[in-house]
Amino acid sequence: MNTMNTALQIRIISAVLAIIALTAWPTTATAPYTAIIMESGSPYFVPKSATVSTGAPIRWENPTPTEHTATHVGCLEDGESCAFDTGIVLPNNTFTLPGLAPGRYPYVCRIHPIMHGVIIVTDPAATPSHL
């Protein structure tokens, strides 16, 4: 009887350790991001207006055969704060911005000024919850 209890205890301990090991295994999940596609035709940036939460990553994807940029208009105006500039995003490449503070960020393609969009960053912590 004592041997059976010991065997049962070993099985239970083994099962518990296996569960702990499986739930503690590190994951390689990445934070979700908002994708903005650079297009060759209107509206050029899809979506043209993107709303994201504070600190949420934003990724520009360039599937076109042409180079593009996504440059905050503050980078182009004297005395203004430059929030981001992707630099040249080559064809079939991407640029990911780790996140922005709350605000409204209009941007353009420096190579093709007809291309423009806006990122609106909200702070979910500042929004009162409804019960």
Regions found by a protein language model. Name each.
Residues 3-13:
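Bacterial N-terminal signal peptides that target proteins for export
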Residues 14-24:
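Bacterial N-terminal signal peptides
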